[in-house]
């Protein structure tokens, strides 16, 4: 089975190499690069990356490389959204860290049935030792909980801090939610 998968992956990469990178990467290279800088320099992300590297299994391309890619792209989307709204650098930094945490952990239980639910529960436990406030941990929990494609999502009550209405991680909705709540007394950033 692994040989078949390896051949399929190799062929898929050959096909992809024939085409230019998606416009997103060209049009938003500043955001991708800035997100990568946050990813590579933030101590919370560095510590979480070490944890994920030790605990994630590669499951048909959903291993560490995939988690890093999702985290960096999530951060880029957050940067784009925040630039449009005009939030402060401090607030942007915190949002980027939160979505990058969600990106790193979103497939931590990938090999399990109902991996989004189990992964969200696992992430909630793991993140208790990180310098994140309870609301931030809950935001990460709900992003992971609702990320799985082709599965129904749980409608998140506004009091639970995160609105997701899709079958996979919708970083733009996380951004929109934070944008609405940035000045709310409910949001507390360290």
Model-derived regions, located:
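Active-site-adjacent bridging/hinge elements
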Residues: 41-50, 95-98
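Post-HEXXH active-site segment of zinc metalloproteases
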Residues: 114-126
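Beta-strand segments within the central parallel beta-sheet cores of soluble alpha/beta enzyme folds
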Residues: 136-145
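Active-site alpha-helix of zinc metalloproteases
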Residues: 98-102, 143
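Divalent metal-dependent phosphate-bond-processing catalytic cores, especially two-metal-ion Mg2+/Mn2+ enzymes
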Residues: 1-36, 56-94, 105-111, 125, ...
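Generic alpha-helical secondary structure signal
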Residues: 43-47, 69, 139
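Short glycine/proline-rich turn/loop motifs
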Residues: 49-55, 102
């Amino acid at each position: 089975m692994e040989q078949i998968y390896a051949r399929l992956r190799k062929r898929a990469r050959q096909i992809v190499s024939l085409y230019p990178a998606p416009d997103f990467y060209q049009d938003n290279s500043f955001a991708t690069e800035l997100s990568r800088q946050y990813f590579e320099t933030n101590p919370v992300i560095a510590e979480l990356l070490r944890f994920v590297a030790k605990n994630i299994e590669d499951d048909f391309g959903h291993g560490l490389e995939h988690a890093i890619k999702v985290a960096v792209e999530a951060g880029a989307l957050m940067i784009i959204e925040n630039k449009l709204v005009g939030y402060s650098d401090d607030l942007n930094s915190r949002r980027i860290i939160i979505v990058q945490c969600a990106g790193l952990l979103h497939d931590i239980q990938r090999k399990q049935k109902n991996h989004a639910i189990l992964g969200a529960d696992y992430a909630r436990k793991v993140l208790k030792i990180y310098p994140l406030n309870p609301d931030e941990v809950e935001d990460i929990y709900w992003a992971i909980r609702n990320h799985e494609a082709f599965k129904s999502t749980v409608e998140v009550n506004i009091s639970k801090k995160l609105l997701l209405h899709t079958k996979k991680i919708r970083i733009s909705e996380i951004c929109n939610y934070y944008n609405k709540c940035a000045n709310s007394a409910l949001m507390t950033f360290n």
